[in-house]
Amino acid sequence: MIRVDEATVVLGIESSCDETAAAVVMGGNDVLSSVVTTQIEQHARFGGVVPEIASRAHVEAMTPVIRKALQDSGIGFERIDAVAATVGPGLVGALLVGVSAAKSIALALNKPFIGVNHLEAHLYAALLDDPNVEFPMLVVLVSGGNTLLVNMESHGNYSIIGQTIDDAAGEAFDKVARFLGLGHPGGPAIDREAKLGNAQAIEFPRAMLHDGFDVSFSGLKTAVVNYVRKNPAISTQDVAASFQTAVVDVLVAKSVKAAKHIGAKTIALGGGVAANSLLRQEMTATCTQQGWRLVLPSMAMCTDNAAMIASAGWYRLLQDGPSESSMGAMPNLKLTDRTTS
Protein backbone atom coordinates (compact mmCIF):
# COMPACT_ATOMS: atom_id res chain seq x y z
CA MET A 1 0.00 0.00 0.00
CA ILE A 2 1.39 3.39 -0.99
CA ARG A 3 2.04 5.88 1.77
CA VAL A 4 0.02 9.04 1.13
CA ASP A 5 1.22 12.29 2.69
CA GLU A 6 2.05 15.91 1.88
CA ALA A 7 4.95 14.80 -0.32
CA THR A 8 2.84 12.46 -2.47
CA VAL A 9 2.77 13.66 -6.08
CA VAL A 10 -0.22 12.89 -8.31
CA LEU A 11 -0.39 13.36 -12.07
CA GLY A 12 -3.97 14.27 -12.96
CA ILE A 13 -5.59 13.88 -16.39
CA GLU A 14 -8.92 15.35 -17.53
CA SER A 15 -10.76 14.65 -20.81
CA SER A 16 -14.45 14.39 -19.96
CA CYS A 17 -15.74 16.93 -22.49
CA ASP A 18 -13.95 19.57 -24.57
CA GLU A 19 -10.83 20.32 -22.52
CA THR A 20 -7.69 18.20 -22.56
CA ALA A 21 -5.83 18.83 -19.33
CA ALA A 22 -2.96 17.51 -17.22
CA ALA A 23 -1.62 18.72 -13.90
CA VAL A 24 0.90 17.77 -11.25
CA VAL A 25 -0.23 18.27 -7.65
CA MET A 26 1.66 17.53 -4.44
CA GLY A 27 -0.04 16.76 -1.16
CA GLY A 28 -3.53 17.26 -2.51
CA ASN A 29 -3.35 21.06 -2.78
CA ASP A 30 0.08 22.22 -3.96
CA VAL A 31 -0.37 22.74 -7.71
CA LEU A 32 3.04 22.36 -9.35
CA SER A 33 1.60 22.70 -12.84
CA SER A 34 -1.73 22.86 -14.63
CA VAL A 35 -2.06 22.76 -18.41
CA VAL A 36 -5.38 23.01 -20.27
CA THR A 37 -6.04 22.90 -24.00
CA THR A 38 -9.56 23.86 -25.01
CA GLN A 39 -11.55 22.84 -28.08
CA ILE A 40 -13.98 25.77 -27.95
CA GLU A 41 -13.12 27.06 -31.43
CA GLN A 42 -13.50 23.60 -32.96
CA HIS A 43 -17.05 23.26 -31.62
CA ALA A 44 -18.21 26.89 -31.83
CA ARG A 45 -19.64 26.69 -35.34
CA PHE A 46 -21.82 23.74 -34.28
CA GLY A 47 -23.28 25.60 -31.30
CA GLY A 48 -22.19 22.88 -28.89
CA VAL A 49 -19.77 20.03 -28.31
CA VAL A 50 -19.64 17.33 -31.02
CA PRO A 51 -18.54 14.06 -29.33
CA GLU A 52 -16.60 12.63 -32.28
CA ILE A 53 -14.66 15.86 -32.80
CA ALA A 54 -13.94 16.03 -29.07
CA SER A 55 -12.54 12.50 -28.95
CA ARG A 56 -10.23 13.05 -31.91
CA ALA A 57 -8.98 16.33 -30.48
CA HIS A 58 -8.21 14.65 -27.15
CA VAL A 59 -6.13 12.01 -28.93
CA GLU A 60 -4.08 14.71 -30.67
CA ALA A 61 -3.59 16.87 -27.58
CA MET A 62 -3.11 14.33 -24.80
CA THR A 63 0.61 13.55 -25.12
CA PRO A 64 1.75 17.18 -25.62
CA VAL A 65 -0.40 18.34 -22.69
CA ILE A 66 1.01 15.70 -20.33
CA ARG A 67 4.54 16.46 -21.47
CA LYS A 68 3.98 20.19 -20.85
CA ALA A 69 2.53 19.57 -17.39
CA LEU A 70 5.59 17.56 -16.38
CA GLN A 71 7.91 20.16 -17.88
CA ASP A 72 6.18 23.02 -16.06
CA SER A 73 6.23 21.15 -12.76
CA GLY A 74 9.99 20.72 -12.94
CA ILE A 75 9.82 17.02 -12.17
CA GLY A 76 9.99 13.87 -14.24
CA PHE A 77 7.93 10.70 -14.44
CA GLU A 78 10.16 9.10 -11.82
CA ARG A 79 8.81 11.48 -9.16
CA ILE A 80 5.14 10.67 -9.86
CA ASP A 81 3.61 8.57 -7.08
CA ALA A 82 0.15 7.99 -8.59
CA VAL A 83 -1.86 8.79 -11.70
CA ALA A 84 -5.46 10.03 -11.54
CA ALA A 85 -7.92 10.49 -14.39
CA THR A 86 -11.56 11.42 -14.79
CA VAL A 87 -13.59 8.25 -15.37
CA GLY A 88 -16.97 9.99 -15.49
CA PRO A 89 -19.41 11.48 -15.97
CA GLY A 90 -18.82 12.78 -19.46
CA LEU A 91 -18.63 11.82 -23.12
CA VAL A 92 -17.65 8.17 -23.31
CA GLY A 93 -15.20 8.53 -26.20
CA ALA A 94 -13.53 11.54 -24.63
CA LEU A 95 -13.27 9.82 -21.25
CA LEU A 96 -11.64 6.76 -22.78
CA VAL A 97 -8.77 8.85 -24.15
CA GLY A 98 -7.82 10.17 -20.73
CA VAL A 99 -8.43 6.92 -18.87
CA SER A 100 -6.33 4.96 -21.37
CA ALA A 101 -3.47 7.45 -21.11
CA ALA A 102 -3.54 7.44 -17.31
CA LYS A 103 -3.69 3.67 -16.98
CA SER A 104 -0.87 3.25 -19.48
CA ILE A 105 1.36 5.65 -17.55
CA ALA A 106 0.47 4.04 -14.23
CA LEU A 107 1.26 0.59 -15.62
CA ALA A 108 4.55 1.70 -17.14
CA LEU A 109 5.64 3.36 -13.89
CA ASN A 110 4.19 0.60 -11.68
CA LYS A 111 2.22 3.23 -9.78
CA PRO A 112 -1.39 3.29 -8.54
CA PHE A 113 -4.21 4.42 -10.83
CA ILE A 114 -7.06 6.43 -9.34
CA GLY A 115 -10.33 6.80 -11.20
CA VAL A 116 -11.82 10.17 -10.27
CA ASN A 117 -15.43 11.29 -10.31
CA HIS A 118 -15.51 14.55 -12.26
CA LEU A 119 -18.27 15.95 -10.05
CA GLU A 120 -16.33 15.15 -6.90
CA ALA A 121 -13.30 16.89 -8.39
CA HIS A 122 -15.31 20.10 -8.83
CA LEU A 123 -15.97 20.01 -5.08
CA TYR A 124 -12.22 20.10 -4.53
CA ALA A 125 -11.48 22.90 -7.01
CA ALA A 126 -12.25 25.60 -4.46
CA LEU A 127 -10.17 23.84 -1.82
CA LEU A 128 -6.99 24.02 -3.89
CA ASP A 129 -6.40 27.56 -2.63
CA ASP A 130 -8.21 27.19 0.69
CA PRO A 131 -8.01 23.58 1.97
CA ASN A 132 -8.62 24.20 5.67
CA VAL A 133 -12.41 24.19 5.78
CA GLU A 134 -14.90 23.39 8.50
CA PHE A 135 -17.44 20.61 7.99
CA PRO A 136 -20.29 20.30 7.32
CA MET A 137 -19.85 22.49 4.26
CA LEU A 138 -22.41 23.25 1.58
CA VAL A 139 -20.98 22.92 -1.92
CA VAL A 140 -22.98 24.56 -4.69
CA LEU A 141 -21.98 22.74 -7.86
CA VAL A 142 -23.24 24.58 -10.93
CA SER A 143 -22.15 23.53 -14.41
CA GLY A 144 -23.44 22.76 -17.87
CA GLY A 145 -24.54 19.28 -16.89
CA ASN A 146 -25.35 19.58 -13.20
CA THR A 147 -26.80 21.82 -10.55
CA LEU A 148 -26.31 20.23 -7.14
CA LEU A 149 -26.52 21.38 -3.53
CA VAL A 150 -24.18 19.04 -1.71
CA ASN A 151 -23.78 18.48 2.01
CA MET A 152 -20.05 17.74 2.31
CA GLU A 153 -19.83 16.16 5.76
CA SER A 154 -16.15 15.25 5.47
CA HIS A 155 -13.65 14.38 2.75
CA GLY A 156 -15.26 11.77 0.52
CA ASN A 157 -18.56 11.84 2.42
CA TYR A 158 -21.36 13.61 0.57
CA SER A 159 -25.12 13.70 0.31
CA ILE A 160 -27.16 15.57 -2.28
CA ILE A 161 -29.85 17.70 -0.69
CA GLY A 162 -30.97 19.60 -3.76
CA GLN A 163 -30.63 19.39 -7.53
CA THR A 164 -32.21 20.50 -10.78
CA ILE A 165 -35.35 18.69 -11.84
CA ASP A 166 -34.78 19.62 -15.49
CA ASP A 167 -32.13 21.88 -17.05
CA ALA A 168 -28.87 22.53 -15.22
CA ALA A 169 -27.98 26.19 -14.67
CA GLY A 170 -25.14 26.05 -17.19
CA GLU A 171 -27.38 24.31 -19.71
CA ALA A 172 -29.92 27.13 -19.37
CA PHE A 173 -27.16 29.69 -19.95
CA ASP A 174 -26.05 27.84 -23.08
CA LYS A 175 -29.56 27.48 -24.50
CA VAL A 176 -30.52 31.10 -23.87
CA ALA A 177 -27.21 32.33 -25.31
CA ARG A 178 -27.75 30.21 -28.42
CA PHE A 179 -31.29 31.56 -28.83
CA LEU A 180 -30.02 35.14 -28.48
CA GLY A 181 -27.26 34.49 -31.02
CA LEU A 182 -24.46 35.04 -28.51
CA GLY A 183 -22.49 31.92 -29.41
CA HIS A 184 -20.84 29.10 -27.50
CA PRO A 185 -20.02 28.75 -24.65
CA GLY A 186 -23.09 30.53 -23.37
CA GLY A 187 -22.11 31.28 -19.78
CA PRO A 188 -19.34 33.79 -20.48
CA ALA A 189 -21.35 35.31 -23.35
CA ILE A 190 -24.39 35.96 -21.14
CA ASP A 191 -22.14 37.34 -18.39
CA ARG A 192 -20.53 39.82 -20.81
CA GLU A 193 -23.83 41.00 -22.28
CA ALA A 194 -25.46 41.27 -18.86
CA LYS A 195 -22.86 43.79 -17.69
CA LEU A 196 -24.22 46.20 -20.33
CA GLY A 197 -27.90 45.59 -19.60
CA ASN A 198 -30.60 46.46 -17.07
CA ALA A 199 -31.29 43.53 -14.76
CA GLN A 200 -34.66 45.02 -13.75
CA ALA A 201 -35.88 45.48 -17.31
CA ILE A 202 -37.80 42.18 -17.40
CA GLU A 203 -39.31 40.26 -14.50
CA PHE A 204 -38.59 36.65 -15.42
CA PRO A 205 -39.97 33.86 -13.18
CA ARG A 206 -38.04 32.33 -10.29
CA ALA A 207 -39.40 28.77 -10.32
CA MET A 208 -39.67 26.78 -7.07
CA LEU A 209 -38.08 29.63 -5.13
CA HIS A 210 -39.77 28.65 -1.87
CA ASP A 211 -40.28 24.91 -2.42
CA GLY A 212 -37.69 22.56 -0.94
CA PHE A 213 -34.09 22.52 -2.12
CA ASP A 214 -34.49 21.47 -5.75
CA VAL A 215 -34.27 23.97 -8.60
CA SER A 216 -35.81 24.28 -12.05
CA PHE A 217 -34.60 26.37 -14.97
CA SER A 218 -36.56 24.94 -17.91
CA GLY A 219 -39.51 27.28 -17.34
CA LEU A 220 -37.21 30.28 -17.11
CA LYS A 221 -35.58 29.37 -20.41
CA THR A 222 -39.00 29.05 -22.04
CA ALA A 223 -40.08 32.39 -20.57
CA VAL A 224 -37.06 34.08 -22.14
CA VAL A 225 -37.82 32.59 -25.55
CA ASN A 226 -41.50 33.56 -25.39
CA TYR A 227 -40.74 37.10 -24.22
CA VAL A 228 -38.20 37.78 -26.96
CA ARG A 229 -40.52 36.42 -29.64
CA LYS A 230 -43.29 38.75 -28.44
CA ASN A 231 -40.88 41.68 -28.06
CA PRO A 232 -38.34 41.32 -30.90
CA ALA A 233 -37.03 44.88 -30.45
CA ILE A 234 -36.00 44.27 -26.84
CA SER A 235 -32.34 44.83 -25.96
CA THR A 236 -30.38 41.58 -25.93
CA GLN A 237 -28.31 43.03 -23.11
CA ASP A 238 -31.41 43.64 -20.99
CA VAL A 239 -32.62 40.10 -21.65
CA ALA A 240 -29.23 38.67 -20.67
CA ALA A 241 -29.07 40.75 -17.49
CA SER A 242 -32.64 39.93 -16.44
CA PHE A 243 -32.19 36.22 -17.17
CA GLN A 244 -28.88 36.03 -15.33
CA THR A 245 -30.34 37.77 -12.29
CA ALA A 246 -33.23 35.31 -12.18
CA VAL A 247 -30.84 32.34 -12.19
CA VAL A 248 -28.60 33.84 -9.52
CA ASP A 249 -31.55 34.78 -7.30
CA VAL A 250 -32.67 31.16 -7.26
CA LEU A 251 -29.19 29.74 -6.65
CA VAL A 252 -28.47 32.14 -3.77
CA ALA A 253 -31.87 31.64 -2.12
CA LYS A 254 -31.63 27.85 -2.31
CA SER A 255 -28.04 27.91 -1.03
CA VAL A 256 -28.99 29.95 2.03
CA LYS A 257 -31.90 27.66 2.78
CA ALA A 258 -29.76 24.53 2.36
CA ALA A 259 -26.87 25.87 4.45
CA LYS A 260 -29.20 26.70 7.33
CA HIS A 261 -30.81 23.27 7.03
CA ILE A 262 -27.53 21.37 7.45
CA GLY A 263 -26.00 23.84 9.89
CA ALA A 264 -23.14 24.78 7.57
CA LYS A 265 -21.08 27.88 8.24
CA THR A 266 -19.09 27.50 5.03
CA ILE A 267 -20.29 27.54 1.41
CA ALA A 268 -18.09 26.60 -1.53
CA LEU A 269 -18.83 27.12 -5.21
CA GLY A 270 -17.76 24.73 -7.94
CA GLY A 271 -18.31 24.16 -11.65
CA GLY A 272 -18.19 26.37 -14.71
CA VAL A 273 -21.03 28.65 -13.61
CA ALA A 274 -19.02 29.44 -10.46
CA ALA A 275 -17.08 31.80 -12.74
CA ASN A 276 -20.19 33.94 -13.26
CA SER A 277 -19.46 37.42 -11.94
CA LEU A 278 -22.94 38.10 -10.56
CA LEU A 279 -23.12 34.74 -8.77
CA ARG A 280 -19.76 35.36 -7.12
CA GLN A 281 -20.78 38.90 -6.18
CA GLU A 282 -24.17 37.96 -4.73
CA MET A 283 -22.89 34.89 -2.92
CA THR A 284 -20.09 36.96 -1.39
CA ALA A 285 -22.56 39.59 -0.17
CA THR A 286 -24.94 36.97 1.20
CA CYS A 287 -22.28 35.03 3.09
CA THR A 288 -20.93 38.26 4.55
CA GLN A 289 -24.42 39.19 5.71
CA GLN A 290 -24.97 35.73 7.25
CA GLY A 291 -21.53 35.65 8.87
CA TRP A 292 -20.56 32.60 6.84
CA ARG A 293 -17.32 31.75 5.12
CA LEU A 294 -17.34 31.57 1.31
CA VAL A 295 -14.77 29.47 -0.52
CA LEU A 296 -14.44 30.41 -4.18
CA PRO A 297 -12.36 28.59 -6.78
CA SER A 298 -10.03 30.75 -8.85
CA MET A 299 -11.41 31.52 -12.30
CA ALA A 300 -9.02 28.99 -13.85
CA MET A 301 -10.32 26.26 -11.54
CA CYS A 302 -14.01 26.85 -12.30
CA THR A 303 -13.79 25.31 -15.75
CA ASP A 304 -12.58 21.77 -16.39
CA ASN A 305 -8.97 21.25 -15.38
CA ALA A 306 -6.69 18.46 -14.19
CA ALA A 307 -5.48 20.09 -10.96
CA MET A 308 -8.84 19.35 -9.35
CA ILE A 309 -8.63 15.78 -10.70
CA ALA A 310 -5.22 15.27 -9.12
CA SER A 311 -6.42 16.81 -5.86
CA ALA A 312 -9.53 14.65 -5.65
CA GLY A 313 -7.38 11.65 -6.60
CA TRP A 314 -4.98 12.38 -3.72
CA TYR A 315 -7.84 12.46 -1.21
CA ARG A 316 -9.34 9.26 -2.63
CA LEU A 317 -5.98 7.50 -2.50
CA LEU A 318 -5.54 8.63 1.10
CA GLN A 319 -8.95 7.35 2.16
CA ASP A 320 -9.70 4.35 -0.02
CA GLY A 321 -6.56 3.35 -1.88
CA PRO A 322 -6.25 2.93 -5.66
CA SER A 323 -8.91 1.96 -8.18
CA GLU A 324 -9.10 -1.40 -9.87
CA SER A 325 -6.95 -1.60 -12.99
CA SER A 326 -10.00 -2.86 -14.88
CA MET A 327 -11.93 0.38 -14.33
CA GLY A 328 -12.96 2.08 -17.55
CA ALA A 329 -15.03 5.06 -18.60
CA MET A 330 -18.26 5.57 -16.65
CA PRO A 331 -20.18 8.22 -18.64
CA ASN A 332 -23.26 8.20 -16.39
CA LEU A 333 -21.43 8.33 -13.06
CA LYS A 334 -23.27 10.03 -10.19
CA LEU A 335 -21.62 12.06 -7.44
CA THR A 336 -22.28 9.43 -4.80
CA ASP A 337 -20.96 6.52 -6.92
CA ARG A 338 -17.61 5.10 -5.78
CA THR A 339 -14.60 4.91 -8.08
CA THR A 340 -12.12 3.28 -5.70
CA SER A 341 -11.93 -0.11 -4.03
Give each language-model segment a name:
Residues 12-13, 84-86, 117, 138-143, ...:
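Short beta-strand segments
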Residues 49, 79-125, 130:
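Glycine-rich phosphate-binding loop and adjoining helix at the ATP-binding site
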Residues 7-79, 85-89, 118, 122:
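N-terminal beta-alpha supersecondary unit
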Residues 1-8, 116-138, 312:
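Conserved phosphate-binding catalytic cores of ATP/NTP-utilizing and phosphoryl-transfer enzymes
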Residues 2-8, 15-16, 23, 33, ...:
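A short helix-loop
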Residues 115, 283-309, 323:
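Conserved phosphate-binding/catalytic loops in two-lobed NTP-binding clefts
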